[in-house]
Amino acid sequence: MSLQTLIEQATNPPESGSAASSPFSTDSFDASVMSTYGRFPLALERGAGCRVWDTQGKEYLDFVAGIATCTLGHAHPAMVEAVTRQIQKLHHVSNLYYIPEQGELAQWIIQHSCADRVFFCNSGAEANEAAIKLARKYAHTVLDIEKPIILTANASFHGRTLATITATGQAKYQKYFDPLVPGFHYVNYNDISAVEAAISELDEGDYRVAAILIEPLQGEGGVRPGDVEYFQKLRQICDDTGILLMFDEVQVGMGRSGKLWGYEYLGVEPDIFTSAKGLGGGIPIGAMMSKKFCDVFQPGEHASTFGGNPFACGVALAVCQTLERENILQNVQDRGEQLRSGLRAIAAKYPHHLTEVRGWGLINGLELAADIPLTAADVVKAAINEGLLLVPAGPKVVRFVPPLIVTEAEINTALKLLEKALATVTA
């Protein structure tokens, strides 16, 4: 079945012959589900391509994609086929046994990256936890560091577990969760002098910097691309000192930047990097990749019950193969240029409200002026009313992360809907 057929079916779903189910209730939901999200008053029930529909039947153009996760959009035929095939074949067994789908996916990643080894898990936070553990063991057993320190960046985001909120250089994610995990130190992003100073200052007694964990492009921190010169100097520092260079590619990796991996924009290779979000196209899966020299894990030192299961790996492999077979990276580059051009044209019409457009491929941010009360959430709410889903990246940046299959016509439609939303909130 083609994607266009799926979209048509989602637009005009067949009427159910059974009795109507109870209407969706946000009150019932809120009474049952923990309040870990500040949710918009919108309940989505189906999707196809770059479109989703709410429980009232209203259609939206989805430029959130599960926050940079639905690589191939919703109900893509390749994913539908892979899900159906794998669930009928084998969906879960323990990692005590060899899992062919896991091996195939690992080999695909290795063939399409700088990695030599892969560890599979279920999310970006888990992948970053694995990277932190691997770096710490390497520090103890290879670098002979008694108390290793990992440098991370201010305004970074690495996950919601206790170690990854500590790695995250944003105090708002750490509030109320003391005591935090020791062994992290923050430096300003794209500031090489801050890195050099930290390495010098922290080299005292049993303490030494063992690794640097950083995003090629800061996503939650406001869609801020890394500077090429900065990252190349980071690589040189790590080569000179033995410090591990680790990249968090959870949001920018798997083609979202227009290249398969964000590090390809920067002209350097990490020793360790992580992936999740777009890897499974919306099916939960994460991965931590490393060069052979720093693969120091032994059996029993790290594990995941669900990580690398046949179902997730089988679907993720289909996503990866579809990216390659359909040359989707070229679409990401073309549509990204179109989107940024359109956003800049809109920004020029609102010079007192909109200050900058930035990003790579199909991860882009529209920054609002700091000296006005208008927030990213205000724009997102207005866009929802117009039928466009967007997501904030901090209080002053509106983020655009559509599925990588988005079309030229859909970009144009999104830009028109955004203009309507902006006209409302700036009136």
Curated annotation (Swiss-Prot):
UniProt catalytic activity: N(2)-acetyl-L-ornithine + 2-oxoglutarate = N-acetyl-L-glutamate 5-semialdehyde + L-glutamate
Pathway recorded for this protein: Amino-acid biosynthesis; L-arginine biosynthesis; N(2)-acetyl-L-ornithine from L-glutamate: step 4/4
Assigned keywords, A-Z: Amino-acid biosynthesis, Aminotransferase, Arginine biosynthesis, Cytoplasm, Pyridoxal phosphate, Transferase
CDD domains: OAT_like
Compartment(s): Cytoplasm
Binding site for N(2)-acetyl-L-ornithine: R160, S304
Cytoplasm recorded as keyword: yes
Other facts noted in the record for this chain: May also have succinyldiaminopimelate aminotransferase activity, thus carrying out the corresponding step in lysine biosynthesis.
Subunit description: Homodimer.
Family in the record: Belongs to the class-III pyridoxal-phosphate-dependent aminotransferase family. ArgD subfamily.
Protein name in UniProt: Acetylornithine aminotransferase
UniProt source species: Nostoc sp. (strain PCC 7120 / SAG 25.82 / UTEX 2576)
